[in-house]
C-alpha cells in the first residue's frame, strides 16, 4: 500500500495542468478546456473579399475538399473570447474595425509610410458566437473579414494560428482596457 502511494507521487508531473474534457460540439469534435491545437494544414488563402458566413463556409469547404482536408478533423478553439495579432499594411486608422487596435498606437508618422501605407501590428478581439468556443470555420471567417480591407502583400497563405501568451499587457496598446489580462492571444502566421 505504501509502495503504491510513493509510486503515484513520482508519476505526477508538477508542470502538467489538468485538461478538462468538456464533451463534443454539434459536429462531434472533442472539446477540451485550456488546450490549444495547432491550426496548421488548412489551405486557406486570404483575399479582399468580405464574406457572409454562408459564403465563407461554402468557399472554405470547397477549398478543403480541393486539398483533401477532412473538415471533421478541424479542432475547435475552446475560449469564449480571444485576441488575435496579425501584420498588415494600412493607409489610415479608419481601416481598423471597432474590435481592432494597433499594437503601437503612437501617431503614424508620414516619414514611416512606404508606398502610401504603414506596416502595423494589429490586435483584433473576437468573441465566440456560442459564448463558449470557436469552430475553426468561425475563427477563420472572422480573421478573414478583419483582414479583407487591409493589404497583406504577398503573405496571403494561412500557415497557422498559434497560441502566443495567455496574459496580455494592456500597456502595449493604449486602446485595450485593463480587463484584458487573462485573455489568450493568438498570432496569425501567413506565408507567401
Question: Where in this protein do the model-derived segments appear?
Answer:
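Ordered hydrophobic segments in well-structured contexts
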Residues: 83, 138, 185-187
Amino acid at each position: 500500500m505504501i509502495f503504491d502511494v510513493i509510486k503515484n507521487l513520482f508519476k505526477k508531473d508538477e508542470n502538467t495542468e489538468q485538461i478538462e474534457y468538456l464533451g463534443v460540439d454539434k459536429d462531434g469534435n472533442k472539446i477540451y478546456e485550456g488546450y490549444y491545437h495547432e491550426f496548421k494544414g488548412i489551405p486557406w488563402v486570404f483575399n479582399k473579399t468580405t464574406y457572409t458566413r454562408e459564403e465563407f463556409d461554402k468557399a472554405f469547404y470547397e477549398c478543403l475538399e480541393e486539398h483533401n482536408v477532412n473538415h471533421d478533423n478541424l479542432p475547435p478553439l475552446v475560449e469564449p473570447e480571444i485576441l488575435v495579432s496579425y501584420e498588415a499594411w494600412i493607409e489610415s486608422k479608419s481601416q481598423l474595425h471597432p474590435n481592432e487596435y494597433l499594437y503601437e498606437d503612437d501617431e503614424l508618422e508620414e516619414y514611416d509610410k512606404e508606398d502610401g501605407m504603414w506596416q502595423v501590428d494589429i490586435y483584433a478581439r473576437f468573441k465566440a458566437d456560442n459564448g463558449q468556443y470557436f469552430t475553426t470555420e468561425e475563427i477563420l471567417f472572422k480573421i478573414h473579414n478583419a483582414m479583407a480591407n487591409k493589404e497583406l502583400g504577398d503573405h496571403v497563405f494561412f500557415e497557422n494560428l498559434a497560441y502566443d501568451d495567455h496574459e496580455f499587457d494592456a500597456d502595449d496598446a493604449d486602446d485595450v482596457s485593463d480587463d484584458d489580462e487573462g485573455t489568450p492571444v493568438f498570432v496569425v502566421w501567413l506565408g507567401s
